[in-house]
């Protein structure tokens, strides 16, 4: 029900208020990699408690919010095909088709990050998704490569390296860090504590993104050959929201003449949109988000 962290000169205090009986275990971890000493607390709902938590009631009656991000836009055309096809136009068309398909689902609320040929910074896209309290963020793109024979679809999520460097940027904004920490009051002296919590949140989000991406790849493979059979990971800024599972989908290669031609057709755009929709439905059905 409520979580609060405070610190005095000697102690770090952790308060948890719950409507249900809970059990907990705690243990410490020695320094590893970029992390120092850590305290891990696992909290379990006691089997004796039959009351359904209020949060579960809310989730059951609320819609799953899917943020659909059409890459590039406005002054940023993205990749340009040999025939002059602009990535920003293709991905907006696919995004609108996906939006229309998801709109028909009773338990889903789709959000278009951009619904016209407009320019948005990568961080503006993240902010809009967070403002709408998105449960899943999907950025749609069309790939390009020096190798003109490169083809197929790919799915990427954030890498751990990208996450660690991003955490410092998020913490630079006091309002963002407070919001991401669930409203906990953390002053300037507690940035190290906030960093640990934010890193933990990012790690969980990346793990969720990876699980979701594998399902998405399986569904994309039904309508398109895969360029990468496994999920790719990189430091895409648009995927760096610490609290929203996110993935970037490269639908096909505009740099490949055959795939450029395919990307321009309504049939392929509809097939890709449907595959993404089916992937989202499976992700929800399996309780990943």
Which residues does each predicted region cover?
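Signal-peptide-cleaved, periplasmic/extracellular N-terminal interaction regions immediately downstream
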Residues: 1-66
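Short beta-strand motif preference
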Residues: 14, 68, 247-249
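Flexible glycine-/small-residue-rich
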Residues: 18-20, 43-45, 70-72, 140-142, ...
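Short, well-structured beta-strand/strand-turn elements
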Residues: 20-31, 106-113, 117, 227-229
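Structural motif
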Residues: 38, 65, 135, 244-246
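Active-site-adjacent mobile loop/cap segments within catalytic or ligand-binding domains
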Residues: 41, 197-289
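Catalytic-core regions of hydrolytic enzymes
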Residues: 48-193, 202-214, 218, 232, ...
């Amino acid at each position: 029900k409520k979580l609060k962290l405070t610190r005095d000169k000697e102690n770090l205090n952790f308060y948890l208020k719950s409507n249900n009986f809970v059990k907990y275990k705690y243990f410490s971890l020695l320094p590893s990699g970029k992390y120092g000493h850590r305290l891990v607390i696992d909290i379990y709902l006691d089997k004796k408690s039959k009351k359904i938590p209020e949060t579960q009631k809310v989730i059951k009656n609320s819609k799953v919010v899917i943020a659909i991000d059409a890459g590039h836009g406005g002054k940023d055309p993205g990749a340009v095909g040999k025939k002059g096809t602009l990535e920003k136009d293709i991905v907006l068309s696919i995004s609108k088709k996906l939006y229309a398909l998801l709109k028909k689902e009773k338990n889903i609320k789709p959000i278009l990050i951009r619904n016209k040929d407009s320019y948005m910074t990568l961080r503006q896209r993240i902010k809009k998704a967070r403002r709408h309290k998105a449960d899943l963020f999907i950025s749609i793109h069309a790939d390009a490569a020096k190798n003109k024979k490169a083809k197929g679809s790919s799915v990427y999520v954030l890498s751990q390296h990208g996450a660690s460097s991003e955490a410092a940027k998020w913490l630079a904004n006091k309002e963002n860090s407070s919001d991401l920490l669930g409203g906990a009051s953390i002053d300037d002296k507690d940035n190290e504590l906030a960093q640990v919590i934010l890193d933990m949140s990012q790690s969980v989000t990346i793990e969720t993104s990876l699980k979701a991406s594998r399902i998405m790849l399986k569904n994309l493979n039904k309508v398109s050959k895969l360029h990468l059979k496994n999920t790719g990971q990189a430091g895409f800024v648009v995927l760096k929201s610490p609290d929203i599972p996110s993935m970037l989908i490269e639908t096909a290669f505009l740099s490949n003449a055959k795939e450029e031609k395919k990307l321009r057709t309504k049939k392929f755009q509809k097939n890709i949109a449907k595959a993404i929709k089916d992937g989202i439905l499976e992700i929800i059905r399996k309780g990943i988000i």
